[in-house]
UniProtKB/Swiss-Prot annotation:
SUPFAM superfamilies: NAD(P)-binding Rossmann-fold domains (SSF51735)
Protein species of origin: Ornithobacterium rhinotracheale
Lineage top rank: taxon: Bacteria
Role noted for this protein: Reductase involved in the biosynthesis of capnine, a sulfonolipid present in the outer membrane of gliding Bacteroidetes and essential for gliding motility. Catalyzes the reduction of 3-dehydrocapnine to capnine.
Positions in coiled-coil regions: none
InterPro entries: NAD(P)-bd_dom_sf, Sc_DH/Rdtase_CS, SDR_fam
Lineage: Bacteria, Pseudomonadati, Bacteroidota, Flavobacteriia, Flavobacteriales
Signal peptide, first to last residue: none
Family under the similarity heading: Belongs to the short-chain dehydrogenases/reductases (SDR) family.
Molecular function (Gene Ontology), one example: oxidoreductase activity
Protein name per the record: NADPH-dependent 3-dehydrocapnine reductase
Amino acid sequence: MRYAVVTGVSSGIGKAICEKFLAKGLYVFGSVRKKEDAKYFEEKYPNTFHTLVFDTTDYPAVDKAVEEIHKVVGKKGLSVLVNNAGVAKYGPIQHVPIEELRQQYEVNVFASVYLTQKLLWLLGASKEAKWQGKVIQISSTAGVMTRPMLGPYSSSKHAVEAIYDALRRELMIYGVEVVLIEPGPIKTEIWGKAKSGGNPYKDTDYGEIFAQLDKAVDEIEKIGLPVEAVAGKAWEAFVAKKPKARYVVAPKKLMFKAAMYLIPDRMLDKIFYKDLKKLTQES
């Protein structure tokens, strides 16, 4: 039996990855914040799905979950950890509340790193281990290319990219692989949850722009790939003997890669500035 841990399986990318791994025969520990959010998997996979109820930022609860995992896995070890849980917020860096920025990092960065640290020994990060697992971190194309107004989310994903690059290189001494999955536009609920339902920046020079962001996000989601596309890449990374360091999952992938790695920063500045001007004209 191969064991996996997947965080944030109640919906979206996490749910799709959990479903994929279960369908392929893995025993999956899936984390949710409310037990009822795991009902779908508990009923469909009663023998191979194990519900873990915790908020990833609640470290004592995470510690208990790790103990729970260890009791089941024992000396067999984990095959893979998929860090998926995350939140998204947008707003102008000039005015975004520090607490909101901190929340992005608490969930998207620190909570992810904490769980990874606690599970690495079960993934074979030890000289005595007789197995080597994988860490799959769900990042974002926003972790490489930053759009205006997405600074809070994008900066947290930049941090994720750097930390897991470092971890990948450090864990080479154990043979434990670390992979980054970088989704672009995906039909998922994360941005729907990010919508404020108001305009906290209406009294700033960004008020008109922010007022149009929800519409802009809706337009991006229309061209988004299904969450199953990300799940497919996660599975590809898991089964690969020599997985890539990172996998981009986006419509028009070559265009995204060009924007991320080839187009000069100043040219991107002009492109994004035109987008901002367009938003003000639409308000």
